[in-house]
């Protein structure tokens, strides 16, 4: 039971939000596991398919500031709903695309929708849970999101191989549409009786605020930690993944899928441990990073 008394409602709000986020991760990782099938469908090479992911991640990064401004203005509920529907639209376009240019547009849409998800879920935590639970739940949110990578191996790839590229992907799109309905029905930006936190900055103030945030030591530390520690796993999961293990290393698809899932399981185990240590020793976060 949470200390603030919101109990099951808080867990429901968070659970629905993190379900949508996990599906976003599943779609994000889909080409990392189905790169060979994508290359066959579009009549190209896995190297070209990896450029889809580069474009997607670049879009994801560039969308962070505008998405953050929209999140401040409209709240998590609308951003999660909109992000999930944009992801579904992008994946539906990818499923029905026959040429590379349309596929690139589809991945741009996925990057935009994906950018709406994680921060929107995190924004719910301090409104619904006691402060001492937020660090652990932030890690658990990322941990549950890693289930999306496992779902990409265990669901997306088998569906594509069994039913074909278009039908397999469209089935995964249906899950995201269902998630959007759940978010709209159950997620609320604040508990009953509390006004949602709305921040509306004048447009002219935005560059100054971005500069101020960018110059803050905590922001710079977080940036360089993610920059140096995350690139290898991101490159593997979202760009090379199973095609590299199958074609480059000669593993069977089952062996490659097992190794792919192992990376996600390892992060799921480590996440809550790091979150708990961060909550207990907030002034030792830099030591934990090192």
Please state what every model-predicted region is.
Residues 106-145:
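Cytoplasmic helix-loop-helix junction between adjacent transmembrane helices
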Residues 43, 75, 96-102, 130, ...:
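Helix-breaking motifs and short loop linkers at transmembrane-helix boundaries and internal kinks
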Residues 29, 57-65, 149-150, 264-272:
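Residue-level signature of mid-helix packing/kink "hotspots" within the transmembrane helices
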Residues 63-75, 270-283:
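Helix-to-loop junctions at the C-terminal end of transmembrane segments
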Residues 31-32, 217-261, 268-271:
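Extracytoplasmic gate region of multi-pass secondary transporters
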Residues 62-100:
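Conserved MFS/SLC helix-loop-helix module at the cytosolic interface between two early adjacent transmembrane helices
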Residues 1-7, 190-223:
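Juxtamembrane intracellular "pre-TM" segments in multi-pass secondary transporters
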Residues 141-189:
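Helix-loop-helix hairpin linking two adjacent transmembrane segments in secondary transporters
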